[in-house]
């Protein structure tokens, strides 16, 4: 049997340069700007750009739905196309340099016609934004929008496709029916595995164009879906859908519209079904709603976001010099210098002797000599420590939302010259860790103390364990609640909620105004429904823009970042005190984040960030495959089960007094008079899941140190290797 997923080509080490090409330092903008009056200018730009970007995403999605419904070809969503949308959505006080009816590109004409006919009626009349002096800032926004759309497609397409398959084939309903029909646990487990493998083969057939391997009853449906999802595509580049998604993400845009449309039909059926069921009706249960997704990401939060400011933006917005003034100054200088300056088509100064005065710098000569340094020195306190970084140099660019500022640095060589980016090379600091199962453990490493870490989604973010000199277990925890408290996330959320509940506009609180959007669906791909959403969203935004422009919303974001750095630094110091310095221990991290999942209702797991924190602190960090580390007892290495039930904390379950199994406590639930199962003695310990996991990891690492392989109980069998669809590639075959 072949593997269920095609192998992904390993990245060649020679194509990866192991340092970050750019880095940032973050601070409050008040600490770095010289003239506070310019903060008002920045805030004004932030507000305008935020409005333009919000409208751009909405306009783009509406336009694509229109094209999809009319079976028209989708445009290539690139920087030029996005900048055309900016032009369509905004006005200019100065029309010089704009397009005429004759010179206007065809694509821009089509967008203008769509705007006038369909989108303009959805905009509040006095919400039109002026484009003047924003072109350099919007250039960077166009880059970000294109990147966001491409990443959204390439990262999430397979997940959405798998969800569509599960819902269409009613995988959950079939699984529940098996649970209901088979009381014998062993038989039930076998039936569940059979169903899982059956659905996996369907997923495999829908992610390649090879011969069908699934059950024949699915073949007709699969062939139909291949045509509907992929259109005329008959193969993937490198015969791999993951590779093809990265190489040509926008070829899958229509596919996502189709998938979302089909899921929306199911969503509407469930909604209608639930609306027809009365609360007191015990005969028929309400169906669980499915979650839709946004094909095109929208900016629903209207709090000001970061914008990019470079030297050109400073010149056009801070010096307040119009192009006409620049042209006059150029002519005067040309006359004075007796033709030493040659100007051709208003392009650049050549061989000009310009005084070292910032007001003589313009968009034509800002790159000459020391001009950029003069410019930034004039407006910002560039002598401060925040503008310095070892092996890096300030790149004459910042990102700011009017409260925080991120200062961008570029890598320099030994001579202090910025490193030129090499085509085809990927720059990233080495955060990927080697698996302990594959690592070459030297005698020096074997003598070092081992600390294993089990990362989690909620509760304990990391649970660490190690053996002391007497062989007793030492533990260390860094919890979600500790992080929330130290970053003051919960405090800021409560303050924000209180303000939104107490502030009134037109006799309505902020919460009440926002609640009008709850009956509408921003994720819909139905043209009329999305139009209703855009119209209502624009009305709500118009009312709430002034409220969300208040500084404390952005200040809380900066405070959380600063507090998080302090919390993580404190965690590292406590870890050192508990286990020792980097020269004495090695860390083995569970590979929990190697999937694309995230548990609903919990904050995303941040395992990669934690590994980077420990590596930056100087520790040697390895990964370990977590297979069965929570499932098996660390004493007898037999399976554990959940046993304790308690009242569910979910609001919908509280009314029914529903009980759930506690996930964090495990024990052996099978027992017999001799206390043995299959001649293997069972222990009677009640295990904490995380504590059990780190002890199992310690056992596995010690076994690897002695034998070079994992213990058999923690090794995937041949069948597991063939059918496993986990993204983790480090599977040990020891059979």
For the regions a language model picked out, list residue spans one by one.
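Positively charged, helix-rich recognition surfaces that bind polyanionic ligands
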Residues: 2-289, 293-735
């Amino acid at each position: 049997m072949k593997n269920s997923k095609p192998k992904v080509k390993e990245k060649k080490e020679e194509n990866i340069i192991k340092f970050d090409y750019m880095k940032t330092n973050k601070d409050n903008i008040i600490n770095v700007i010289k003239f506070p009056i310019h903060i008002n200018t920045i805030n004004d730009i932030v507000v305008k750009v935020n409005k333009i970007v919000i409208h751009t995403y909405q306009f783009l999605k509406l336009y694509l739905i229109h094209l999809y419904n009319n079976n028209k070809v989708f445009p290539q969503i690139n920087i030029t196309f996005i900048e055309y949308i900016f032009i369509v959505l905004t006005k200019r006080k100065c029309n010089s340099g704009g397009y005429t009816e004759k010179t206007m590109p065809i694509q821009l004409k089509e967008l203008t016609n769509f705007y006038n006919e369909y989108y303009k009626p959805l905009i509040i009349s006095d919400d039109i934004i002026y484009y003047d002096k924003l072109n350099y800032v919007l250039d960077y926004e166009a880059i970000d929008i294109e990147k966001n759309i491409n990443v959204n497609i390439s990262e999430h397409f397979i997940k959405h496709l798998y969800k569509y398959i599960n819902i269409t084939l009613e995988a959950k309903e079939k699984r529940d029916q098996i649970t209901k029909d088979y009381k014998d646990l062993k038989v039930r487990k076998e039936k569940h595995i059979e169903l899982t493998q059956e659905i996996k083969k369907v997923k495999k057939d829908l992610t390649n164009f090879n011969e069908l391997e699934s059950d024949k009853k699915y073949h007709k449906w699969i062939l139909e879906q291949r045509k509907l999802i992929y259109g005329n595509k008959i193969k993937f580049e490198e015969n791999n859908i993951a590779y093809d998604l990265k190489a040509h993400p926008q070829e899958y845009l229509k596919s996502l519209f189709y998938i979302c449309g089909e899921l929306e039909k199911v969503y509407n059926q469930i909604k209608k079904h639930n609306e027809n069921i009365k609360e007191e009706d015990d005969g028929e249960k309400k169906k669980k709603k499915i979650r839709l997704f946004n094909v095109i990401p929208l900016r629903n939060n209207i709090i000001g976001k970061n914008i990019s400011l470079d030297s050109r933006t400073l010149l056009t917005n801070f010096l307040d010099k119009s192009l006409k003034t620049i042209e006059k100054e150029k002519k005067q200088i040309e006359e004075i210098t007796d033709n030493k300056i040659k100007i051709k088509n208003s392009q650049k100064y050549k061989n000009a002797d310009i005084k070292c005065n910032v007001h003589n710098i313009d968009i034509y000569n800002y790159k000459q000599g020391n001009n950029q340094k003069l410019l930034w020195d004039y407006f910002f306190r560039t002598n401060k420590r925040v503008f310095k970084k070892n092996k890096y140099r300030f790149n004459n660019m910042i990102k700011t939302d009017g409260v925080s500022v991120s200062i961008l640095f570029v890598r320099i060589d030994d001579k202090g010259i910025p490193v030129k980016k090499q085509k085809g090379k990927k720059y990233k600091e080495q955060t990927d860790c080697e698996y302990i199962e594959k690592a070459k453990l030297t005698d020096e490493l074997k003598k070092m103390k081992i600390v294993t870490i089990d990362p989690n989604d909620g509760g304990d973010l990391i649970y660490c364990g190690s053996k002391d000199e007497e062989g007793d277990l030492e533990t260390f925890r860094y919890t979600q609640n500790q992080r929330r408290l130290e970053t003051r996330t919960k405090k800021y959320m409560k303050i924000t909620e209180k303000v939104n509940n107490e502030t009134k506009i037109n006799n309505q609180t902020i919460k009440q105004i926002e609640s009008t959007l709850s009956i509408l669906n921003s994720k819909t791909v139905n043209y009329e429904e999305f139009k209703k959403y855009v119209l209502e969203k624009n009305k709500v935004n118009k009312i709430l823009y002034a409220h969300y422009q208040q500084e404390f919303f952005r200040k809380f974001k900066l405070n959380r970042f600063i507090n998080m750095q302090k919390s993580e630094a404190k965690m590292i110091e406590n870890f050192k005190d508990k286990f020792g310095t980097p020269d004495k221990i090695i860390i083995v991290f569970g590979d929990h984040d190697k999937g694309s999942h995230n548990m609903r209702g919990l904050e995303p797991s941040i395992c990669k960030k934690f590994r980077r924190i420990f590596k930056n602190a100087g520790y040697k960090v390895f990964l370990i495959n977590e297979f069965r580390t929570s499932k098996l007892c660390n004493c007898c290495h037999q399976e554990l089960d959940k046993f304790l039930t308690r009242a569910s904390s979910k609001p919908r379950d509280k009314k029914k007094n529903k009980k759930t199994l506690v996930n964090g406590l495990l024990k052996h639930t099978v027992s017999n008079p001799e206390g043995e199962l299959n001649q293997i003695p069972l222990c009677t310990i009640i295990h904490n899941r995380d504590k059990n996991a780190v002890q199992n990891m310690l056992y596995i690492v010690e076994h690897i140190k002695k034998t070079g392989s994992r213990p058999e109980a923690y090794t995937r069998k041949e069948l597991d290797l063939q059918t496993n669809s986990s993204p983790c590639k480090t599977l040990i075959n020891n059979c």
